Curated annotation (Swiss-Prot):
Superkingdom classification of source: Viruses
Taxonomic lineage from the root: Viruses, Duplodnaviria, Heunggongvirae, Peploviricota, Herviviricetes
UniProt modification remark: Phosphorylated.
Pfam families per record: Herpes_UL14
Name of the featured protein: Tegument protein UL14 homolog
Length: 243
């Protein structure tokens, strides 16, 4: 390796010397021509001959160096290929268990076994899906429908709007007093009452709160609250009476 590097440095130095010698003689030849020296002048002939020889030497050395570089490039290509083969053989040696001729047969058998198990799994899933479609679990039974209906009715009862009414009442001095009366549905209780058979029964009682607000001419507000428990069946009558 060191010998090759030294040889390359030596050949590059020789090529540079040939190039410099050619440049010097060529410049001297052109200088004589610019001075009007005849081409048959002995001095011109000597300088021109030296320049031509230097040019030939430079070209020969350049071709030699180029051939040398081409040879070196070829050897590197071959060496690179050899190194590649060595690395490939190393990888194959490490994984030599994968080079078993029976490996392909084993792989095929394993793949068939996997596919067979996947088919069994898919068939099981199809059977489960079919059973789920036959058994309709989306419909509600009577007990569930009754419970759902009760919840809906209770929700509507709790969301009853407030009934409000405002009136204008005259006073003894001829002034007007504003009287506002509001009815609120404040809640629902489940009361247990005994029956004739001795069994308790559940009775829904709704609390109806009536608020009467009186605004006097002098700006004084008076509010009167009245609370009354009523059953759902007479809720509308209570609301009308409170108003």
């Amino acid at each position: 390796m060191f010998a090759v590097s030294a040889m390359r440095r030596r050949r590059r130095r020789i090529l540079a010397e040939c190039r410099t010698r050619e440049a010097v003689y060529k410049e001297r030849t052109l200088e004589l021509l610019s001075q009007g020296v005849e081409t048959d002048d002995p001095e011109f002939i000597e300088v021109f001959t030296s320049a031509r020889n230097a040019h030939s030497d430079y070209k020969a050395q350049l071709r030699s160096n180029m051939r040398l570089e081409a040879t070196d490039r070829k050897t590197k290509i071959i060496q690179r290929h050899i190194d590649e083969q060595l690395d490939r053989r190393l990888i194959l040696d490490i994984n030599r268990k994968l080079l078993n001729p029976k490996l392909q047969l084993q792989l095929d058998q394993t793949e068939e076994a996997i596919l067979e198990k996947e088919d069994i799994l898919a068939q099981t899933i199809d059977d489960i899906t079919l059973n789920d479609s036959i058994t309709n679990t989306d419909e509600l039974d009577e007990e569930s429908e009754a419970l759902l209906t009760k919840w809906i009715l209770n929700q509507k009862t709790k969301k009853r709007p407030t009934v409000a009414k405002t009136a204008i009442a005259p006073t003894a001095h001829g002034l007007q007093t504003k009287v506002s009366r509001n009815v609120f549905i404040t809640g629902k209780d489940d009361l247990v009452q005994p029956t004739d058979l001795g069994q308790p029964s559940t009775h829904e009682v709704i609390t109806c709160t009536s608020r009467e607000r009186i605004i006097h001419p002098d700006g004084i507000h008076t509010e009167i609250y009245t609370t009354e428990d009523v059953s759902p069946t007479i809720l509308d009558d209570v609301s009308d009476s409170c108003v």
